[in-house]
């Protein structure tokens, strides 16, 4: 924890000649950083009568909040759902490699697995601050096993579960301690799901609806019970129907609690979601859209077979299938690619595309005071981008942690 006294004595960095994303607008302003946080320059000038200790010219580039990926199953040969004696080293490798894609924080995601896998893996993935070693870990996302058999997608049917009479006790028996967990994806049509949603949210865990055949009413009741997120909208759920739009209908439902914003993940990899579907969702509910990669261990690798939890996926070009099927088995597109594709597919503003990968996931997790923005007092986690939104440099707590060759600052 950075104390005020330590921060006050730290050097002041001034990033100049840049466009910073703040308040939904790209502003031609300087970015001031001290002690790992975004600094208000007026207080520096008028209260402390100080100037910057160091200036860095950004060459007119964009400075945006660091990307946050709340659904990533692994990457670069690492499978988060594989129970080993040293899960941490794999998480560290992925965290390090994500820096080149502008990701400063992420939620390692475990797909449906037997209880012994959760019991072994979860204690090995603690919440961890980011830095030169890699992107920060915000908590684990547990996707399954309490999901629909019909909409299980890439999840192995043998390990799917329903809630027993003592529902939350069953959750704890399956997962073990939830200290390192920040999101749980479940199907709201399962019996006793609302009891579980209430228990999870009481512990500060976000509940996401997904891999589900729920109708709209069941989804609305789940949100009224505390659910706040939808896992990869359109994928692994009932298709939109005009008489019952299912979970998709939450985007425009008038039955949600007053002031409640439902967030929803979208895989904008050019494979999982048609551009027209991206446009429909964004135009219906832009402030809730959260870009996710749903990346699998094959991210960053070539064609061939790779693991995903208890199954294998086969990569063919830009597509990952469950081996021997035509069922999609996650994505192999990193977050910066998803941001660029989303921008092109929807025709939205650059600001909107960047906020979908930063501010919105931070808001969904309740971290918007420290992550996902360049507001004064927020963590100085940001990405430097050129006009085509290619990553030039990544900073965590104001420290340069990755830089493209021949790029600055």
UniProtKB/Swiss-Prot annotation:
Q: Which GO terms describe its biological process?
A: N-acetylglucosamine metabolic process; N-acetylneuraminate catabolic process; negative regulation of UDP-N-acetylglucosamine biosynthetic process
Provide the reaction this enzyme catalyses: N-acetyl-D-glucosamine 6-phosphate + H2O = D-glucosamine 6-phosphate + acetate
Residues holding a divalent metal cation: 143, 211, 232
Cross-referenced CDD domains, in alphabetical order? NagA
> What positions does UniProt annotate as the active site of this protein?
294 (proton donor/acceptor)
For this UniProt record, give its keywords in alphabetical order, as a comma-separated list: Carbohydrate metabolism, Hydrolase, Metal-binding
UniProt remark on cofactor binding: Binds 1 divalent metal cation per subunit.
Q: Does the keyword Manganese apply?
A: no
So which domain of life are we looking at?
Eukaryota
According to the UniProt entry, what is the EC number of this protein?
3.5.1.25
Could you tell me which InterPro entries the record lists for this protein? Answer: Amidohydro-rel (IPR006680), GlcNAc_6-P_deAcase (IPR003764), Metal-dep_hydrolase_composite (IPR011059), Metal_Hydrolase (IPR032466)
Q: Which family does it belong to?
A: Belongs to the metallo-dependent hydrolases superfamily. NagA family.
Per the entry, what this protein does is:
Hydrolyzes the N-glycolyl group from N-glycolylglucosamine 6-phosphate (GlcNGc-6-P) in the N-glycolylneuraminic acid (Neu5Gc) degradation pathway.
Q: What is this protein called?
A: N-acetylglucosamine-6-phosphate deacetylase
């Amino acid at each position: 924890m950075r104390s005020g006294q330590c921060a006050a004595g730290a050097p002041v960095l001034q990033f100049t000649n840049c466009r910073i994303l703040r308040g939904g607008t790209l502003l031609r302003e300087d970015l001031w950083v001290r002690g790992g946080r975004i600094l208000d320059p007026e207080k520096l000038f008028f209260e402390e009568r100080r100037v910057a200790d160091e200036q860095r010219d950004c060459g007119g580039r964009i400075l945006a909040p660091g990307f946050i990926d709340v659904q990533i199953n692994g990457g670069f040969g690492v499978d988060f759902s594989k129970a080993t004696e040293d899960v941490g080293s794999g998480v560290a490798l992925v965290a390090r490699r994500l820096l080149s894609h502008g990701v400063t924080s992420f939620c390692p995601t475990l797909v449906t697995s037997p209880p012994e896998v959760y019991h072994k893996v979860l204690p090995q993935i603690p919440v961890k601050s980011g830095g030169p070693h890699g992107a920060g870990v915000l908590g684990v996302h547990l996707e399954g096993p309490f999901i629909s058999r019909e909409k299980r997608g890439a999840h192995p049917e043998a390990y799917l579960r329903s809630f027993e009479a003592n529902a939350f006790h069953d959750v704890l028996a399956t997962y073990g301690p939830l200290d390192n967990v920040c999101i749980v994806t479940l199907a709201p049509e399962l019996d006793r799901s609302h009891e579980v949603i209430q228990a999870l949210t009481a512990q500060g865990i976000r509940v996401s609806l997904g891999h589900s055949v729920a109708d709209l009413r069941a989804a609305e009741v789940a949100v009224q019970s505390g659910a706040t997120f939808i896992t990869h909208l359109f994928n692994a759920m009932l298709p939109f129907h005009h008489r019952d739009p299912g979970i998709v209908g939450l985007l425009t439902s008038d039955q949600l609690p007053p002031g409640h914003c439902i967030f929803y993940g979208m895989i904008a990899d050019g494979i999982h979601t048609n551009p027209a579907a991206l446009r429909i969702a964004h135009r219906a509910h832009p402030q809730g859209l959260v870009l996710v990669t749903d990346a699998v261990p094959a991210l960053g690798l070539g064609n061939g077979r790779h693991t995903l939890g208890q199954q294998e996926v086969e990569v063919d070009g830009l597509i990952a299938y469950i081996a021997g099927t035509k069922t999609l088995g996650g994505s192999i597109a990193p977050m910066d690619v998803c941001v660029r594709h989303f921008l092109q597919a929807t025709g939205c503003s650059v600001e909107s595309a960047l906020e979908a990968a930063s501010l919105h996931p931070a808001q969904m997790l309740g971290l918007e005071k420290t992550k996902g923005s360049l507001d004064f007092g927020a963590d100085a986690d940001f990405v430097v981008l050129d006009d085509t939104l290619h990553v030039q440099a990544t900073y965590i707590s104001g420290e340069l942690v990755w830089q493209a060759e021949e790029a600055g600052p």
